[in-house]
A protein has these predicted regions:
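Basic, amphipathic alpha-helical segments enriched in Lys/Arg and hydrophobic/aromatic residues
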Residues: 345-402
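Long, low-complexity C-terminal extensions of enzymes
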Residues: 379-438
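Electropositive, glycine- and tryptophan-enriched low-complexity nucleic-acid-binding patches
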Residues: 68, 74-77, 139-196, 296-308
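Active-site-proximal, Lys/Arg-enriched surface segment
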Residues: 46-47, 80-165
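Short, conserved catalytic/metal-binding motifs centered on acidic residues
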Residues: 57-61, 111-126, 156, 196-205, ...
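An internal, acidic/charged active-site-proximal segment
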Residues: 173-296, 382-391, 429-431, 435-438
Length: 438
């Protein structure tokens, strides 16, 4: 049987240059003694070698620091003690993506709101010593089907379009003893922005306190619990009328099988062969927060077992745009999967608070950058048999691993480790106070 006469797949070196330029841009602003070794940490994450060595940073970095004395130790020390600001790295990576990649921010509504997405993840640490490990908390493990000790991280991403592909660029990471604590830390330290934003979150994050903290500039939209009770807003009183304050309206359960009252909007959409019913209630509020008005959208899709209930404080956004805003939340979840599968986020092998925070945060940063670069480049085939290649972070990591020598040389260009000069002519002095003899 003869082989088909087909032309060979073209190979491109553009991803190698883009990834190397990204690393070089990130570490160039760091101190001289730290930049070189933090660049090596990012190289091991970009090429997937950290996963190959089961999270051992010393073994993954050894081929790049073999020529240095105690090279692997200096890599570990730079990660744990180096002067590195994670927030500054995130902002520099975001600026690099806007400058070097065809990035188009996602905007919704007449107010042109950008869409940041926020979610949390549980990094299980079953074998870690509780007394030795830092930033430990309790989180639910789906594999063990119980609550276990873990590092709980919350990540904030900005959803953008790169060549038509939705990508989440990591902007902040925070840790806590619980997911609620980590999420609260992210909301307390949001990146500054002159634009109006609509934060897309999930059910565990869309709490009453977060809806109360939302503002007109930074609105909140997220999935609500199925059994959440809400109230209709009271009818406005005529101006100048005195008397007792107006009583709130009747109770509404938007997630119930038969919600009370009539919705303000009730439409039916045709998606493929399914008929999806979409209902909207305006000017609802929680019993504990009568001054915080929200709009609630319920989506009944035959393909899902439970209805999707979405609440938002951005009441000027249309019903279709609310559904789209919640759909933009999914790019943050692949960031966790990419960081776990190819950046060894689930195997941090770190114990101090600084090392744990930097290992997990840099893994999320490397994963989001790889996804962004892969979306901007042509699909990378794994071999001559791969005729349906796609642009993914895993394929890009495999391509960078094949070009590891050139990739490392480009990423560490104009960077060199600090050399420590050994003092050969040390002068002994007798002025140093000696300890008292026993």
């Amino acid at each position: 049987m003869s082989k088909p006469n087909t032309p060979p797949l073209p190979l491109t070196a553009k991803p190698v240059y883009l990834a190397a330029h990204a690393i070089n841009t990130l570490v160039r602003t760091l101190p001289v003694g730290t930049a070189y070794f933090i660049g090596i940490v990012l190289i091991t994450m970009f090429t997937g070698q950290l996963v190959h060595h089961q999270g051992s940073l010393a073994r993954a970095a050894l081929p790049y620091v073999r020529h240095l004395r105690w090279g692997w130790h200096r890599v570990e020390r730079a990660l744990e003690r180096g002067k590195v600001s994670l927030d500054a790295l995130f902002e520099r990576a975001f600026t690099w993506c806007l400058t070097c990649l065809p990035v188009e921010p996602v905007r919704l509504g007449s107010e042109r709101r950008t869409v940041p997405a926020l979610d949390s993840s549980t990094v299980v640490r079953l074998r870690a010593n509780k007394k030795r490990s830092a930033l430990m908390g309790k989180g639910y493990c789906h594999r063990a089907q119980r609550a276990v000790q873990a590092n709980l991280v919350a990540a904030l991403t900005t959803v953008v379009l790169i060549c038509g592909v939705r990508v989440g660029l990591v902007r902040r990471t925070r840790f806590g003893a619980t997911c609620q604590e980590a999420v609260a830390k992210v909301f307390a330290d949001l990146p500054q922005s002159s634009e109006q934003r609509l934060f897309s979150v999930d059910a565990g994050i869309a709490t009453i306190e977060q809806f109360q903290a939302a503002t007109a500039r930074d609105a909140l939209g997220g999935r609500l619990r199925k059994n959440v009770p809400l109230r209709r807003a009271p009818h406005p009183k005529p101006p100048g009328q005195r008397g007792r304050p107006a009583q709130p309206g009747p109770v509404v359960h938007p997630g119930a099988q038969r919600p009370e009252g009539r919705p303000d909007e009730d439409t039916t959409l045709r998606i493929g062969e399914r008929e999806v019913r979409v209902r909207r209630w305006r000017n609802l509020h929680f019993r504990e927060a009568p001054r915080t008005l929200i709009d609630v959208v319920r989506v009944d899709d035959p393909a899902s077992k439970r209805p999707l209930v979405i609440g938002t404080t951005a009441r000027a956004v249309t019903t279709a745009e609310i559904r789209v805003a919640y759909g933009h939340r999914w790019p943050i979840e692949p960031n966790f999967f990419v960081a776990q599968g190819t950046r060894a986020m689930e195997m941090p092998r770190a114990w101090s608070a600084t090392a744990v925070e930097r290992r997990i945060s840099l893994a999320l940063l490397a994963g989001s950058l790889l996804k962004a670069i892969a979306a901007a480049c042509a699909p990378l085939p794994m071999g001559p048999w791969d005729w349906k290649a796609v642009s993914s972070a895993g394929r890009l990591a495999n391509h960078l691993a094949l070009q590891a020598g050139n990739f490392a040389a480009l990423a560490l260009q104009d960077l060199a480790p600090r050399t420590y000069r050994k003092i050969t002519n040390a002068k002994e002095t007798t002025e140093v106070q000696l300890p008292l003899a026993a």
